[in-house]
Amino acid sequence: MRCVPVFVILLLLIASTPSVDARPNPKDDVPLASFHGADNANRILRTLWNLRGCCEDKTCCFIG
């Protein structure tokens, strides 16, 4: 009976693991998330850089 809780916990851990895709990706297949992450980071940096100069006099500041 001592093994039952351990067995239940192992079953829960196995069930919560992400599924594996059965089809392997070809060598030239690049996930789009890598491109979107760089675009989002550049957009955020540009926005912050543009807000640095105009928020001093509050004329074009979008933050409060």
Curated annotation (Swiss-Prot):
Keywords: Amidation, Disulfide bond, Secreted, Signal, Toxin. GO terms for cellular component: extracellular region. It is found in: Secreted. One of its GO terms (molecular function) is toxin activity. The modification Isoleucine amide is found at residue 63. InterPro entries: T-conotoxin. The keyword Hydrolase does not apply. Contains 2 disulfide bonds that can be either 'C1-C3, C2-C4' or 'C1-C4, C2-C3', since these disulfide connectivities have been observed for conotoxins with cysteine framework V (for examples, see AC P0DQQ7 and AC P81755). Residues 23-52 form a propeptide. Residues 1-22 form the signal peptide. It comes from the Eukaryota. It holds the Pfam family Chi-conotoxin. The keyword Mitochondrion does not apply. Its main location: secreted. The cysteine framework is V (CC-CC). Belongs to the conotoxin T superfamily. This is Conotoxin Pu5.2. It comes from Conus pulicarius. The lineage of its organism: Eukaryota, Metazoa, Spiralia, Lophotrochozoa, Mollusca.
